[in-house]
């Protein structure tokens, strides 16, 4: 089996819903970040064997968004590309598939990650295929229907977070405090320019000229008092609010994986070695607890234990599920999401799995920590995890 290394990890800044990236398509974002990642790696477009990208809200994007991004980025058309939809796990699953292709010897260099513009998700009408003879036509929000709605229980993902809060006895106060800490850590990281190296600036044309978007815009100033004033967002008597949940966001994340021997032969700098992955499954109605299962399976697969991990990046879909995972694994919160998480930074669903790994890799490089783990929950009751190591 071939050893697989990371030779580049880049992302866009994360845009707020209907914010700076609202008119920048997933294709355009992906091309911009992919080109920057290639430049950072020292590879040429012709060195790439395959492109594998996660995307959830594919309606209206045209055929195979990964192939569109591949060709627009200058990667030759005799190479291949495909898109992956595993809801929030899409881009991490893309990374796993890329890793496996290299490990098994099918490819040597694979671009992977994910793209998502939730702001541009279209409305759908299932009434129009055969026409409407009279009366109103129903419109479906594809962002909610395809990205945020539990297909098994017919309710919003937020209900699953309330279910986890109830099952694990997590109070509203604990959730709000967790959310506040995420915001404070993210703001401190932005002020210290910790994300600068991982972010690809994107030029956006508007009526006033060209604006360079290069800083996460979703983090917001907040207090426990302001969080406490928010009403429950999903259940009338629930504890999950807009303030202790992740956002609806836009962004792209790209990672380039390479056969270790190939990287050495080309003289490429490596950020980390991929040690392995873990998957987990649970009941869809408490999907947020699944990272704890995925991480346990991941560590078993790579013959490590929790004490071997120096840093964790856990996607903060909701404060409730994040706290539950911390409790379930008995993790030290001081080594988890040290620069804030999705509650502050945002959650562009098809790109988030790669986003947390990009951030983890750069924090490991900055801090010198040797082993890291990134994990996230997946709508429908699944979880994904990856362990990486600096050598």
Residues covered by each model-derived region:
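Conserved active-site "lid/cap" helical segment
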Residues: 1-61, 65-73, 77-80, 160-172, ...
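N-terminal extracellular/periplasmic Venus flytrap/periplasmic-binding protein-like
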Residues: 11-12, 23-27, 31, 40, ...
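Beta-strand segments within the central parallel beta-sheet cores of soluble alpha/beta enzyme folds
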Residues: 46-54, 80-85, 110-115, 174-181, ...
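Conserved catalytic cysteine-centered active-site region
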Residues: 55-110, 152-156, 221-247, 328-355, ...
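Active-site-proximal alpha-helical scaffold in enzymes
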Residues: 86-116, 165-194, 254-261, 326, ...
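Flexible glycine-/small-residue-enriched beta->alpha junction loops
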Residues: 109-163
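Active-site pocket-lining segment
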Residues: 159-162, 195-198, 275-344
